[in-house]
């Protein structure tokens, strides 16, 4: 789990006079949220906010879904007005990674604005994945993941805009690049601010354990003369390492000695990795590039024409920067999911393009980084983690109709924009969003229920994942509900039918599940690439004419596996998750959410 608590304390009398780091962090975060709340639905003045907010999409279906949701948000005045909001879609064909998406976005900006964008502050949010590790975000996008916060509720987009609210005021024209599924919180001095005003690239850096460093980018900073660490430091960077081994961190002098670090300054996934005298490194999150650097990358992209390999905005752009950068990394493909023949050559071209460009680092010594991109992280942060709950003011019941929630062993359930009967039970550790649950529904612990409608008697086993989608098939409205275990690995794939026994559904051998459902093992059982067979491409989810029938039918197949009792799927039209996303009816899903919103609003006004 990528949960990182980063904190350095100043020594001496200064530390004694200040609030504890966790208090400063909470107050700074709440101030940003209040400021953003004031701007929602208001016309912002030039320079007060971003000139452009751009979101990347993987394909045209995702582009349409994002544009529909942005349109609804603007209509409901949930976002600042007077800002240009865009969705930029990757070109059809080979996957190009977030680096390729960045290049594509630059080209889109040039086409839309010509030379005008050289005076704009631009936020670019990468949200072009299919969220296979958190599938309730697959249909409508990671950047539109609902949070238990705000009225109307915040989604990740609003939270990003809130946390970065101070940036545009202190930024030269250029582009801030970030991802859709992480949260950066930080606290700095009352009269300090983060400046993005240097030429080249500027990145935020956070102190982290060496273990966390192996899954992030790590900065090799130039020596620092000041004996006291401050909340905000501007540092120069010698070179950038992408997901290095601990051995490499030491080899390239990326490791800092403990000094003023305290063990309580780390939390979440770092606790087990740290000792009181732990060494640490500075890891990455978001980065900024000035307009000159952006234009240089754009000229490069227009020269090469079409990309045929995945480029990483962090691994391939940042590793080329700083005086200590060397070309060796271009041949290291150990962190690459799919190795294309052109990848090494493309990396080398990018290296020679960017070599000599400066990499400036803004060190935030009292900061936190949260990644919410998996079912495990999602459940933990929304139901169990008191730190994030305190910092953001997360609630157990957010804009919902539901009785009080009991707490058990520090865990609560989390209900987001849903209507639940008072006799319905939801066990601690579970999240319910955009759903209606009747009086005879019981939800076990550690479940995720999304977009569902259950009025009949139903028991959802612990650790269930249930997410319903509206579909448009042959111009008819249909529904399908994906159901499996929250710990199932949807990305794990095998190459042949004989190996599908290696896949697991709800912790049970997938081959055994097919027997329970009376389904035969044939190539037709899977959609898409027939040499990449996975739960993601398995045609096992029934298509139904109503939302409630869809949920109940999928729950029957889930319970059949749990209880080892037969439930034949032979009579149903079956889809894979991959196909459900192709047929998804975004408009109907938004309408369903809007109906819940209006009903809650009406009942709240009568109370």
From Swiss-Prot:
- Please, which domain of life does this record's source organism belong to? Eukaryota
Activity-pH behavior: Optimum pH is 6.8 to 7.8.
The answer on whether this UniProt entry bears the keyword Nucleotide-binding reads yes
Which UniProt key words apply to this protein? Cytoplasm, GTP-binding, Nucleotide-binding, Nucleotidyltransferase, Transferase
Q: Does the record's keyword annotation contain Transferase?
A: yes
Q: Where in the cell is it found?
A: Cytoplasm
What ranges does the record give for the region Disordered, renumbered to this chain?
1-21
- The protein's enzyme class: transferase
Q: Name one GO biological process term.
A: GDP-L-fucose biosynthetic process
Q: Which PANTHER family match?
A: FUCOSE-1-PHOSPHATE GUANYLYLTRANSFERASE
* Annotated protein name in UniProt: Fucose-1-phosphate guanylyltransferase
Q: Which gene encodes it?
A: FPGT
């Amino acid at each position: 789990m990528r949960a990182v608590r980063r904190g350095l304390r100043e020594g001496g009398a200064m530390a004694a006079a200040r609030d504890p780091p966790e208090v400063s962090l909470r107050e700074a975060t709440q101030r940003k949220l209040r400021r953003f709340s004031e701007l929602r639905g208001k016309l912002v003045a030039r320079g007060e906010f971003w000139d452009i907010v751009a979101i990347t999409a993987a394909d045209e279906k995702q582009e349409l879904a994002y544009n529909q949701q942005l349109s609804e948000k603007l209509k409901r005045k949930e976002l600042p007005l007077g800002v240009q909001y865009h969705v930029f879609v990757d070109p059809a064909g080979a996957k190009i990674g977030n680096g390729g998406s960045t290049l594509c976005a630059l080209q889109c900006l040039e086409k839309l604005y010509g030379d005008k964008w050289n005076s704009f502050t631009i936020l670019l949010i990468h949200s072009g994945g299919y969220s296979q590790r958190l599938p309730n975000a697959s249909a409508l996008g990671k950047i539109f993941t609902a949070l238990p916060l705000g009225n109307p509720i915040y989604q990740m987009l609003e939270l990003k805009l809130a946390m970065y609210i101070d940036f545009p005021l202190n930024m030269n024209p250029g582009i801030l690049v970030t991802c859709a599924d992480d949260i950066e919180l930080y606290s700095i001095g009352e009269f300090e601010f983060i400046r993005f005003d240097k030429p080249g690239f500027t990145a935020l850096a956070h102190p982290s354990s060496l273990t966390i460093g192996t899954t992030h980018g790590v900065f090799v900073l130039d020596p620092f003369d000041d004996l006291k660490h401050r909340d905000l430091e501007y540092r120069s960077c010698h070179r950038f390492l992408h997901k290095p081994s601990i051995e490499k961190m030491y080899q390239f002098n990326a490791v800092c000695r403990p000094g003023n670090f305290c063990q309580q300054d780390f939390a979440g996934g770092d606790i087990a990795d740290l000792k009181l005298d732990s060494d640490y490194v500075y890891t990455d999150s978001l980065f900024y590039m000035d307009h000159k650097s952006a234009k240089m990358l754009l000229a490069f992209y227009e020269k090469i024409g079409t990309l045929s390999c995945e480029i990483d905005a962090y691994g391939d752009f940042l590793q080329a920067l700083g005086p200590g950068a060397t070309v060796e990394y271009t041949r290291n493909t150990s962190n690459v999911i799919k190795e294309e023949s052109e990848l090494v050559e493309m990396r080398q071209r990018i290296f020679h393009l960017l070599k000599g460009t400066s990499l400036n680092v803004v060190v935030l010594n009292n900061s936190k980084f949260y990644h919410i991109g998996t079912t495990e992280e999602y459940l933990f942060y929304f139901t169990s983690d008191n730190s994030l709950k305190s910092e953001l003011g997360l609630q157990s019941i957010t804009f919902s109709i539901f009785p009080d929630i009991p707490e058990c062993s520090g865990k609560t359930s989390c209900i987001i924009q849903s209507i639940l009967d008072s006799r319905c039970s939801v066990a601690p550790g579970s999240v319910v969003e955009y759903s209606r649950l009747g009086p005879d529904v019981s939800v076990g612990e550690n479940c995720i229920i999304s977009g569902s409608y259950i009025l009949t008697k139903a028991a959802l086993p612990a650790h269930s994942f249930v997410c319903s989608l509206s579909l448009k098939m042959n111009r008819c409205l249909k529904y399908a509900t994906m159901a499996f275990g929250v710990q199932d690995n949807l990305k794990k794939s095998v190459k042949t039918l004989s190996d599908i026994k290696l896949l697991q559904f709800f912790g049970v051998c997938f081959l055994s599940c097919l027997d329970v459902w009376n389904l035969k093992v044939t190539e037709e059982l899977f959609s898409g690439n027939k040499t990449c067979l996975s739960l993601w491409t398995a045609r096992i989810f029934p298509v139904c004419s109503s939302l409630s029938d869809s949920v109940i039918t999928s729950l029957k197949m889930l319970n059949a596996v749990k209880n080892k009792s037969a439930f034949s799927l032979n009579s149903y039209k079956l889809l894979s998750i991959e196909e459900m996303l192709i047929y998804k009816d975004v408009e109907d899903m938004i309408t369903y959410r809007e109906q819940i919103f209006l009903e809650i609003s009406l009942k709240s006004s009568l109370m």
